[in-house]
Every structure is written in C-alpha cells, then in structure tokens.
C-alpha cells in the first residue's frame, strides 16, 4: 500500500475547503448524497448507449448507515464507482470535478442533470470526520479499491473486496469537544431531518434503517422494538409533477409539510417556465398574517433548489419587500452557485427569475381582485398595509406596480373599493379624489371636515392606517386625478368670491383670534365646509395634521409640524358670542378663542398643550 501526496498544493486547498468554503457543517450529508445521486445517473447514462445493458430504477438507491459503536457514518450508492486511476485523479486532486469530466468525455449536453460542478463536495466530509475511507468498484470492473485519508498527510489506495459496483464512503467522526457534538450525526432523527431538509427531492431512494415499535406477538400491551429499512426522501418534487394531476389538497398538504403555515393558504401558484430562463416554482399567498410579520425577526424569501437540492432556505433576492408575505419554493438548473453551493453568485439569471416571479404574483393578485373579491379582501385585510408600504418605499419607485392593487373603505359604498372603481364613478364636475384620515371609520364619519364634500355627493375614501396618507402623497394622482384631503385648505369646491367676501367682512375678528393663539396656527379664516360645527382645523403645505401625529409618535421625532389653519363657521351661534365678546370683554374673547382651538384639537385627536390651563378655562366659564 503506497502513501500518496495530494497533488499541486492540494493540502493547502483542502484546508481552505474544510475551514473556509463551508460555513455550515451539516451540509456534508447533502454533498455526499448529491455525489451518490450523480454516480447512479452516470450508470443510467452508460446504459442508454449500450443496448446490452438495462437500467431498472428500482434497483438503485442510496443507503445511510450509522454505526454508534464504531462512530462511523457510511453513505453507500449503487452508482458507477471508480477505478484506481479515477480514485487517484478525482480524490487526489482537490477541486477536480469527476462529474464534469464524465460529461465532457461522454459529450453530454447541459440538459443532463448532474449536480456536481466543482469537485469539492466530497471533502466536506472532513467537516465532521478526521478520517474518510472510500471503498469502490467501478461499473464493469473486476477489482475494487480502498482510498483512505485523514485530510492532512495525503492518502493511500489499496485493493479491496466489494461484491457489486458502487461506492461506500465511510466517515470516521471526530471526537466530541466542548463546542461540537459529532455523535448527533449518528442519531436517526438528525439524519432524517437533514435528508428531508436538503435532499428530499433527490430522484433516487435514500434509505435508512429506522427503529420502530410494535405489539409483541402473543401479548396485548407489551411492545418490542424492531428495525426496518425506510425510504426517507420524497424523490419526486411536487413542482415537477403535472399540475393537472394535482389537487388542492396536494398543494395544501405541501404547504403544511414545508411549514410555510399551519392553516390553508389563500391561493397557490404552480409555475413552470422554459426559455431564456427555466425554473419551476410553487408559490403560496397566505390567508393570515404571520405573528412576527411586522417585526425585525421576520425573514422574507423563498426556498431555493438547484436540481432538487436545497441551496438556500430563504432566498430574499427572489421577492421584493412588498411581496415578502409570499411563501414557496423555486427550483432551477440555470443558477450560478458558488463553490460551496451555500450561496448564489449574483447573476443575471437570478434577477430574471425574480422579475418573472414578481410579475406572476402581481397578475395573480389582480386576478383575485377581479374574479374572487371575497378572497382578495381577506388577503388585503392581512397584507394591504405591506402593499402601501411598497408604494411609499424607495421614493415611490414601485407605485405604478402596486397602485391598482390598493383598496380603501368608501363613504358611499360602505365597503372596500379600488382606486379604479372610485374614479370610474366620479361626478363629471369632481376635480379630486377625496380622502379623510382618522383612527377608525367611525371617527372619520364624525369629522366636521367631511360635511361639505358629502353634501356635494362626492365619495370619500377613509384612511385609517398610519401609512395610508404617506403612500398617497407618494402616488400623487391616479388616472390624472389628484388626491385631496378633506382637511386641506382648498377643497376645490368653495366659491372663491364668497370666501373672499366673508374673510374681508370678518377680518378684524379673525386677526384678533390669530393674535390670541399666536404661533399655534398660521391663519384664521371663514369656513365654507362646516355646517353643524363651530370650528375645525385644516392644514396648508405638504404635512397634514394626521402626518404630524404619526411623525410625532416616532422615536426620532424631528418636531415636524403641520401649518394649521383654524376655520370658523360664521353661521354658527357660537360665532355671534365671539363677536359680542370681542366688543365687550377682550379677556372673555381670548378665553373663547383658546377653548375653540382646543376643541378643534380634540376633534382631530391631537393633544392639548396644557390640560391644566384648559380645565381652568372651562371653570372660568362655569362661574
């Protein structure tokens, strides 16, 4: 038995493979199972070119054999095996891919799904083992060979005994220490979970001897344990099956099996794309919002597979943030992986797949809104806020993508409506899309600012979430119709001549009110929007009163204030009391003015600056 050295700085490269390339030691099993699958594929390919050979898929499988006494883990396959020369060339040279060499020698086109690319997957075994033994017999050969290495001082190759072709890879596990428990890779539950997680859709059976329990023969309650060989993996991915043969239960069960959620999804999409990009995907739109969805702990992303092998549990690059609620998987052969297969190289194919998925999701939501309104409203109740964040984020870059998916409660319809539905039934003389902002629909219905708009027969959209107005400010208009808050200074309804006349006639009292309130307001003016209320607040400029409330509640509050205007109903009886007070008792006039302003603040849901002063003012009136 001859001791051989690793070729061409392979020792140094092996150290890099073991300590730098792989960040997660548990993926060693994924790599070795993928290699075993490739080895069986090569046998299948050999039989295609030789009519004297047959390939019965039922005869080919991968076996995982833990041995707790010897602390070894064996991965066996009935694949093509290796000759002595191939052992020396493939395992003696780090980063030489035997699979790529096989494809080249046999002139196999890229459509043949061999997983291996880089020739380093085998060496991931050294993440958990301090010695690896390989016993292999090549397809059609008479002799078997043993390759053995500790990953440090080269390797040995010697003749061995093996009845049939294929390969056994025996991992001699490292000793446990304070940081690592390598014995866990001998436990049945751990091996099953790793196979299901990473290699569930390998096309050949992955078998494991499983301990089970049964009632002992001849007894009623006495149980005995027995060992039975079990196929752990599913083999055929749901996304590669004909969608016409699948039922809703198939998709719903897969949703639960993958732990995307514990209830039924609202919608599923089964996508198969071939062309410039090729991928298969199953996507789900959940009905209910995850408990942590609006927290920093929530991670968006789709499970990403390459040739049925899990590459990433959550590939965030496949989903824009505003569709981050979507769950599912994507499988593609066109991905450029890095050498560890743990991460993707940033390439055009991934971007194309992501763009295509984004379009598919949007189309599905639009279809749901049009054809299944009840389901869409369920979805929107859970995730509508996220769509509105999408409009607002990135300086409105995605507003055109999302605007048709938005919905708001309507004063006229008493239900949720889309912007398209609102615009479609606008009156001919209506200039704006009107909206009102408040904590709830009930609160908005009591707002004094809505009176004039409703009297004109115009519809008002109710904004009850903190993001609503910010999103609409970014959207600016819809189908060339601008948005207008009922609390804005100019509603586009009032007669300018009448307003000007009333403000001129009451110039003195308005100036006195402004003087009494000082910098709290920017102006006092006559209101044409009020009927039953004496006063209300409106705003001028880009920052509305509601936006001020939201911004002031934020931790990094910059003290942004709306330019408040106190609007006065000159037809209200309180206004006559104001005029009398101005003529006869300036202190009482100032008191009335402050009380009316504070009343307007309370109606808007704003805090009174000095509650003690406010209660004292009320007491003065009661004396």
UniProtKB/Swiss-Prot annotation:
State the encoding gene: htpG
In its UniProt record, a GO molecular function of this protein is: ATP binding
Does the keyword field hold Metal-binding? no
**Protein family according to the UniProt entry:** Belongs to the heat shock protein 90 family.
Q: Which GO terms describe its cellular component?
A: cytoplasm
The listed locations are: Cytoplasm
Protein name as it appears in the record: Chaperone protein HtpG
Return the annotated region ranges for A: 1-341
């Amino acid at each position: 038995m001859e001791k051989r050295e690793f070729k061409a700085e392979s020792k140094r490269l092996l150290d890099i493979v073991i300590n730098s390339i792989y960040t997660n030691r548990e993926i060693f099993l994924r790599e070795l199972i993928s290699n075993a699958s490739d080895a069986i594929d090569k046998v299948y390919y050999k039989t295609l070119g030789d009519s004297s050979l047959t390939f019965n898929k039922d005869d080919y499988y991968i076996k995982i054999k833990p041995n707790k006494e010897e602390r070894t883990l064996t991965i066996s396959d009935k694949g093509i095996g290796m000759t002595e020369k191939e052992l020396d060339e493939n395992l003696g040279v780090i980063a030489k891919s035997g699979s790529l060499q096989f494809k080249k020698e046999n002139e196999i086109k890229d459509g043949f799904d061999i997983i291996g690319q880089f020739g380093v997957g085998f060496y991931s075994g050294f993440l958990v083992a301090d010695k690896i033994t390989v016993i292999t017999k090549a397809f059609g050969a008479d002799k078997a060979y043993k390759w053995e290495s500790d990953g440090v001082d080269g390797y040995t190759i010697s003749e061995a005994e093996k009845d049939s072709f294929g390969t056994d890879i025996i991992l001699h596990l490292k000793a446990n220490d304070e940081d690592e428990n390598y014995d866990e890779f001998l436990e049945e539950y751990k091996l099953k979970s790793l196979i299901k997680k990473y290699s569930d859709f390998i096309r050949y059976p992955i078998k494991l001897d499983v301990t089970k329990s049964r009632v002992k023969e001849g007894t009623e309650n006495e149980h005995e344990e027995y060992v039975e060989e079990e196929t752990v993996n599913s083999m055929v991915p749901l996304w590669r099956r004909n969608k016409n043969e699948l039922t809703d239960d198939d998709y719903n069960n897969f949703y639960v099996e993958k732990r995307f959620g514990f209830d039924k999804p609202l919608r599923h999409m089964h996508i198969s794309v071939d062309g410039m990009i090729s991928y298969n995907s199953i996507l789900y739109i959940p009905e209910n919002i995850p408990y942590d969805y609006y927290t920093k702990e929530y991670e968006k992303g789709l499970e990403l597979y390459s040739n049925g092998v899990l590459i990433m549990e959550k590939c965030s690059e496949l989903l824009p943030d505003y569709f981050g609620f979507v769950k599912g998987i994507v499988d593609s052969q066109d991905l450029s992986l890095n050498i560890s297969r743990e991460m993707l190289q940033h390439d055009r194919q991934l971007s194309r797949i992501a763009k295509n998925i984004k379009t598919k999701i949007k189309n599905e939501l639009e279809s749901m809104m049009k054809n299944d309104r009840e389901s869409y409203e369920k979805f929107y109740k859970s995730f509508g806020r996220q769509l509105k964040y999408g409009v607002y984020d990135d300086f409105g870059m995605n507003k055109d993508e999302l605007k048709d998916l938005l919905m708001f409660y309507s004063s006229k319809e008493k239900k949720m409506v889309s912007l398209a539905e609102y615009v479609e039934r606008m009156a001919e003389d209506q200039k704006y899309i009107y909206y009102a902002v408040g904590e709830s629909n009930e609160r908005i219905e009591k707002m004094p600012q809505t009176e004039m708009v409703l009297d004109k027969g115009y519809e008002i959209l109710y904004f009850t979430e903190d993001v609503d107005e910010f999103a609409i400010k970014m959207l600016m208009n819809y189908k060339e119709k601008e948005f207008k808050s009922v609390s804005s200074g100019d509603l586009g309804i009032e007669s300018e001549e009448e307003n000007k006349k009333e403000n001129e006639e009451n110039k003195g009292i308005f100036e006195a009110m402004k003087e009494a309130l000082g910098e709290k307001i920017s102006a006092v003016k006559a209101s044409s929007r009020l009927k039953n209320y004496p006063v209300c607040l409106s705003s001028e400029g880009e920052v509305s009163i509601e936006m001020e409330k939201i911004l002031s509640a934020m931790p990094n509050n910059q003290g942004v204030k709306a330019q408040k205007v106190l609007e006065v109903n000159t037809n209200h009886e309180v206004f006559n009391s104001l005029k009398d007070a101005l003529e006869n008792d300036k202190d009482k006039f100032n008191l009335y003015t402050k009380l009316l302003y504070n009343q307007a603040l309370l109606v808007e849901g704003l805090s009174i600056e000095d509650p003690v002063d406010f209660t004292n003012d009320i007491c003065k009136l009661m004396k």
